Amino acid sequence: MLSLVFSAMTGLVGAATLAATLSLLVLLTAAASARRRPAPISAPTLLLAVVVPAHNEEAVLVSTLKSLNAQSYPAECVEIVVVADNCTDSTAAIARRLGATVLERTHASERGKGYALNHAVSHLLIQPVVADGFVIIDADTVAAPDFLQQISARISQNTDPRGYGAWQGRYGVLNAHDGWRAALMTTAFDLVNHVKPLGRDTLGLSAGLKGNGMAFTRALAEVLPWPGGSLTEDLDYGLELARRFDLRVQYVPEARVQAQMPATAEQAASQRSRWERGRYRLVRERALPLLGEGLRRRSFLLLDAAWDLLMPPLAEIATLLLLFLGLTLLGTATYLLPHPVFWLSAAGSGLLGLSVYVFGGLRVAGAGPEAYAALARAPFYALWKFALLFTDWKRTPKSADEATADEWVRTERIPQADAAPTTEIRHL
């Protein structure tokens, strides 16, 4: 009986982690085979509204707006709109000084990025001249000089008969050299924000929205308002695109943005805590209903979205694979597992597959030596992350109302010197 229970437990852990690893390898294979799309030569020039949600961002907003003002795109075709949401600093004044349209918003309870974006897009949709596309850039972000050109070209190539379209640019790290945490985030972003969406896009699936460097057509903005009270408003919006319109998010790796990441333990804990609380709440509330709806509608797009929600993050997959290996070794030593060669082979294959994904993915992403070097810190990061999750477990919001209260509890920023990300994208 004990052997049966132990085998079932080991098999459950192994099946889940091996399925996740196989999924990552499929995406890596697709990403590695993706063809580089040549930059458009004579794409139509569209009117774009660039929305920058900001809450007390005076330390970093100058670099963001300078990068947007320096775009290789006709200035008369771009309106930069900064939403100064519940600000108590000079964010609004800085934005006006640098030529942006400023929408100042104050609300006692509806606070956060989602509400700010909803306010801005609603305002822009009722203007006499409405933009062809809406672009969302975070206030701590530097956009590559050709970012808007690449986004505009993709919008102009949209073939959806309804005019609906959503795109995600390549979202990377601006301060990769500010300590090992930022360096490791660079490595993670190469895998999560480039390899996975590139693979999904190549397979005809939704690349997903990452919250920064996103773009939407006017037609889509008119029928689907941006969600307000959510810590994961970008993920929620992407899921609604699939549910309501059978629409996938397309990936534009040539359109690059880079944002500041935490460099200290305190900053990292604040950001990671918010991200993980939002993600787990989203999984709890939406994954199984989405899976059921996908089965009822026979929609592979919805089934893939549900699977993506259920699949653990990379650190958790690695930890579970090590747990699988540990259970296998224990079961082999105590004779609780039959056919030990099978179990050991499965555990070894999982770890090998994950290693192939990580190192192969970094090669596809064109990562530099610092990205590989940062992997040496990954075990310490995983331990820190699980300790943080355990600490936060009892504080996880049980409802959207609870989550809303800390949406603008943002990470402290480090003032950045003027910078711009490289536009070069290296491929295999």
Write out the residue ranges for each language-model feature:
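Long helical/loop segments within the catalytic core of UDP-sugar-dependent glycosyltransferases
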Residues: 106, 110-127, 145-230, 273, ...
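N-terminal membrane-anchoring/stem segments of glycan-assembly enzymes
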Residues: 1-44, 358-364, 385, 422
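Membrane-embedded multi-pass helical conduit in multi-pass membrane proteins
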Residues: 29-33, 40-42, 308-395
